[in-house]
Amino acid sequence: MPCLLLDKMVAFATALRAAVVVVVRPVNIRCLAFYANAKHAYRITKPQSGTVGLHHEQQHPQQPQQQQRRYKSQFRFTLEGGTKLSASQRQFYEDNGYLVVRGLFEPRELQAFSKRFEEIACGRAKVPGLTVMRDIALKDAANPDKYVVNKLQDLFLDDQLWQYCIDPRVLDWAEAFVGPNQMAVHTMLINKPPDTGGLTSRHPLHQDLHYFPFRPADRIVCSWTAIERVVRENGCLVAVPGSHKGPLLEHEYPEWKDGVNKAYHGIKKFEQASERRVHLEMEPGDTVFFHPLLIHGSGANRSKGFRKAISCHYAASECEYIDVAGTSQEIIAKEVIEIAHRRGLPISDYSEAAH
């Protein structure tokens, strides 16, 4: 069965068109795909660990014994030494599974990302291989522009949007959760549109680890930055504090009357008491870091404007792929394979590429 991440599949499938170097090699655990943006020569190393991704430019090599010692701590979800976390921030993340950093970016800095989104969504800029997604309630509109596009993925293919993922301010905070050797494994610019009445702009409660076939989960973190003001009215993030300490739950498409956007899986039969949920209202430039097992989602955008945010998931280079056959992740694996076939990648499992 496939051990595959959506962004990685898309990057692999579009490599030749996007000037991305793809090298497939067998390693002792599984066949894995390694890619790097040839134009920028981002380093891809550590083949012995069987990892996929784009590393933090400033590497801090460690011997295996040193790395093991680094992970031994009274804390489970954060790492010792060289981080920006205060004692109270560290304990908050340990207890709750998320941490909001206020004012990490100046609002004016983020306008470049918003402008670039509009250039791509309106067709003024073409980025080969970039995934452009449209809201299910708007995709048949006559003018597929910024009012229809609700998400861009695979930001590493665009020089301007990629700057967010390699910004030292983000990487320094991410180091507190994944360590100094980092990979960008999933990238998005989200443009939540005003809801048309069918509530399709919602994102069901889910856990990001559902989409990630690699472990350990504790060495993965999401950085999510508000480009515009994010409040309950326009569908801010909602999270269940402490849920990151639980297991990965079974996901499926919710049975919503007016449909659900592609790959918007939600936790199956989730009945968490609403009083435990918190709404993460944020100003432009505020950034939340959260664990991949944290249960979270977002409400419908009931405002008349859009709600933009940009995000990147980081994983430690020591992470390794798992086989998802027979697990709750098999459903998303099959969906990813179908997407790969539509994009011209004729393999059903990375293990086939090893022979």
Residue ranges of model-derived segments:
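Short, conserved beta-strand element in jelly-roll/cupin
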Residues: 213-232, 281-284, 289, 313-317
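Double-stranded beta-helix
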Residues: 91, 230-295
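Non-heme Fe(II)/2-oxoglutarate
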Residues: 68-79, 127-130, 135, 143, ...
